[in-house]
Amino acid sequence: MEEKRHGGAGRVIVVILILAVLLAAGAFFLFGGRVRVETPSFSTGYRYDRAKDYATLDTFPVEGVTADKVELHWISGRVEIRAAETISVSENFAGDDAQRLRWRLDGDTLIVQPCASGAQELPEKTLTVTLPQTVLLKVDTVSADCALTGVQTAQLDVDSVSGALRGDAAVTEMLSVDTVSGGASLDLTAAPKKVTGNTVSGVMELVFDEAPGTVKLSSTSGSFALGLPAGAAYQLDWSTVSGDCDASGYQAPEGRGAKKIKLTADTVSGG
């Protein structure tokens, strides 16, 4: 069944409850193009590529480093990211050297790993990062929660297995959130041109202070809640066998929106 719905003025919470087969998995998008992904392996501890190129904070502090992109990898614990005038990286851990974070510069990209390559039995740690608004951001976590405070960036890409994503951010170009069972609750204070949200069983709530460009969502058994600004018009392309969509609260003349926001949700089956 394919269905198209249109809405108009008023503050809206569009709640999409989906039970489906995940249509897209394993894709990584960063900064609008193909990305070099340093995928870790857990078969013999946490391992990643080019391990010899990484340094500890004791050897080479990050303070004073400039980068156009920041890529954060973290396993468990918490990741806190705040807006600032300069880049800084720290962790609340002073234990075994192999379990301390590593970092390196790859051209204009700063990459942070949670430990030495090959380390095992990693403790829960808190990673704290500050970023200026010109920096593009990529975050990969396993079970670590991620908190954003006043982050300003053109592109934000977050991938998590079971960690939660919370906070506020001003994203102007691209927002991508992918989880397995982790939840996300974001207050978006700018208007990103492109938004994608994918989850297997997580709950995502995205509240926009300004109308975004396009929003595309997909899920297996998770749910989505979208908050759009007062007066925003939208067009929802809803393709499903038996999914549910609640767009109560929207009223539009003759049931038509102005296509200012395009929302797309694809499912196979649901209840």
Task: Walk through the language-model features, giving the residues of each.
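Hydrophobic alpha-helical transmembrane segments of integral membrane proteins
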Residues: 16-34
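Short linear S-[DN]-x-LW-Φ motif typified by the pepsin-like aspartic protease active-site region
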Residues: 28-113, 126-138, 145-151, 155-157, ...
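Short glycine/serine/proline-enriched coil/turn segments at secondary-structure junctions
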Residues: 119-121, 142, 255
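N-terminal Sec-pathway targeting helices
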Residues: 2-22
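Secondary-structure transition/turn motif
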Residues: 113-123
